[in-house]
Amino acid sequence: MGMHIEMKNISKAFNGNPVLKNAQFMIETGEVHALMGENGAGKSTLMKILTGVYKKDGGTIKIDGQERTFKNAKEAEEYGIAFIHQELNILPNLTVAENMFLGKELMYGKTGILRTRQMNAIAQQQLAELGLHVRGAMLAEELSVGQQQIIEIAKALMTNASVIIMDEPTAALTDREIETLFTVINKLRKEGVSFVYISHRMEEIFSICDAITILRDGEYVGKRLIPETSFDEVVSMMVGRSIGERYPERNSQIGDVIFEMRNGTKKGKFENVSFQVRKGEILGVAGLMGAGRTDIMKAIFGYEPLDSGQIFINGQEVKIDSPIDAIRQRIAFITEDRKSEGLVLDFSIRENLALPNLENLSKGSVLSNELEQQFTEDMMKLLNVKASSGEQAVKSLSGGNQQKIVIAKWLGIHPQLLILDEPTRGVDVGAKKEIYSIMNKLTEQGDAVIMVSSELPEVLGMSDRVLVIHEGKVGGILGKDEASQESIMALATGGE
C-alpha cells in the first residue's frame, strides 16, 4: 500500500471561464494533506480531475512517477483513489453490509443469490477494525452521520484505496464523532494510506494534517508544513490579504426587548423554554447536536408551531402558526440546510432573491422587472456575491456565495429579528468574515440576531450573550464575561 501523486500546471475551463490555472498538488504515502482555499478556489475541481470526473485541459498527473489519467471515477477507484463527498453516498434503506458491497456483491456462483451472512460478517469485521461496532444487517438509516462516514472509509478500503479524498468530512459531525474520525485517520496513515483533507476548519487542519496546499482563484499559491506555518499565514495566503482579526469588532448598543419566548413547548422536542432577545443584540445559541436548538428556531418561524407557551414581539403577544405569520412580524430564518431548504438550486440568483420579496418587488399585483433587477444588483453588491450576473443559476455558485444569496433574499423583508442556523458551515474564512459583518450591520441598525452555531469559537467571538440548550431545556444563559468554551460545554452536557 502507498502512493505518491504529483499534479503540475493543471488547467481547466468551463464554457470559456477558467476555473484552474497552473494548479499544483503533491501528496506522499501516509500523509494527511489539507487542500485549502476560499469557496470557488478550485479545490473540488482539482480533485475531480485527479479522479477522472472532469478531464483536464492542460498539465500533467504523475502517480508513482508514471504519467496517468483516469477516464472516470470508477477507474480511479479501481486504481486505489477514493473520493468521499460531503453528501455521503449511503443508501439509508439498505443494510450496512449492502452499502459496503454495493456493486461488488458476493453471490453463490451465477445464481444471483447473495451471500448475505458472509457479507454481514466481513462488513462487521472491517468496521470493527476501524473502531465501529455495528451489525452488518443493521439499516444504514439507523446510524449517525459520523458512523456513516466510517462506513464510507471502510468501503474505500475494501477497494484497496491508498489515497482517500474527503470533502468537508466533519461538517455534520459531533465533537465525539470528529475524535473517532481522527482516530481512524491516524490508524490508517500509519498503514500507508494517504488522505486529502478538504476543509475550512482551521483548528482541525492544524490538529490532524501534516501539510497544507493553498489555492486562490484557481491558482497554486503555495504549500506549507503544519509545524512551520500559522493560522494567520494560511488565511493571508488563501484570501491574498490579511483579514485582520477573525471576528470583526462589535460596538453593541443593546436596547429594549424585541423578542421573548415564555415557556415554549413542542412535545418530544423541547419544553418550558424561556428567553429574550434585545434590539442591537446577537444572541448565540449553543448546545450538543440533537439538543433541540433548531427545533426552537423552527417554532419561532412557524415551521413547527408551539404546542404551548407564548411569543411576544416588542411587548405584544403574537401567534405564529406559519412562516407567513413570522414574515409579517419581520422575522427571517436562514436554515442550516441551505441546499434543500434555503434555495431553489435550479433557479437563478434573481429568482431566488425575489421569492420572499414578491410584494415589495411588485407594482400593483404585477412583478416589476425593473424593481427585481435593481434589488438583485443592490443585494449582490451589498454582500459581495461573486457571480457572472443575476441570471446565473445558484447551483453553480460556491458554498459561500450560496449562503450569501440565502441571507440576501431575507434582508429584503428588512427583518427586525434574523435567525441564522449554522450560518458559516462549509463557508471559507473570507466569506465568514463578510457574514459576520452583515450581522453587525443589522444590530447597529437596532435589529436583533439569533445565531445557532456548533462552532464554539464563533459563538464566543460574535455573541453578546449565549443561550445554552440541554436536552430540550434551557441549560443556562451566559453573559459575554461569563461565557467560555468550558462554561458552555458544562451547561450543554447538563453540568453546572
From Swiss-Prot:
It is an enzyme of class 7 (translocase). It catalyses: D-ribose(out) + ATP + H2O = D-ribose(in) + ADP + phosphate + H(+). Keywords: ATP-binding, Cell membrane, Membrane, Nucleotide-binding, Repeat, Sugar transport, Translocase, Transport. GO terms for cellular component: plasma membrane. Its EC number is 7.5.2.7. It is a peripheral membrane protein. One of its GO terms (molecular function) is ATP binding. InterPro entries: AAA+_ATPase (IPR003593), ABC_carbohydrate_import_ATPase (IPR050107), ABC_transporter-like_ATP-bd (IPR003439), ABC_transporter-like_CS (IPR017871), P-loop_NTPase (IPR027417). ATP binds at residues 37-44. The keyword DNA repair does not apply. It is found in: Cell membrane. It comes from the Bacteria. It holds the Pfam family ABC_tran. Residues 5-242, 252-496 form the ABC transporter domain. Its main location: membrane. The complex is composed of an ATP-binding protein (RbsA), two transmembrane proteins (RbsC) and a solute-binding protein (RbsB). Belongs to the ABC transporter superfamily. Ribose importer (TC 3.A.1.2.1) family. Part of the ABC transporter complex RbsABC involved in ribose import. Responsible for energy coupling to the transport system. This is Ribose import ATP-binding protein RbsA. It comes from Bacillus cereus (strain ATCC 14579 / DSM 31 / CCUG 7414 / JCM 2152 / NBRC 15305 / NCIMB 9373 / NCTC 2599 / NRRL B-3711).
